Amino acid sequence: VEDDDVSNREGLSAKMFFRELYGSEFVRKADNAINSALNYGYAILRSAVSKSLVSYGFNCALGIHHMGEFNAYNLSDDFMEPFRPIVDYWVDANHTDLCEDLTMNNKLGLINLLNQCALCGGKKVKIRYAISLLVKSFVSCIENSVADGLLLPEIIPFDEAE
């Protein structure tokens, strides 16, 4: 992906990714159970990331790569990117059990993703804490004018996370 992604490589890659998982007719913006679950899961992540960013004094509307004029969560969307695979993984693992209107159990499963584990800085931590570590490490990078030291998470498959 190039700077500013003028060739829309990220979008094309996402399209290919979802079609590989759910079939050649899958459209990400369609009104269906899979998209409902993806949207709900991403909203949970976005909320947790926003909470952490605001606690460090960031304005979530001012993004690094996401710069939508009418998006109040550009920075949140930047920071949630490394966590998206955990939602994708859960939805793929559960897509046959989803209904267009998500059940309470579906929603609880997606909310509980914040309690799944990731590796961050060589330690196994909950996703909700990995988010905080990522933001804290970003603050440190800014304060020290260095690019290395950003604690990016490594998502652990659910069956290995226990």
Predicted regions and their residues:
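Active-site helix-to-loop segments that bind/position phosphate- or nucleotide-bearing substrates
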Residues: 1-162
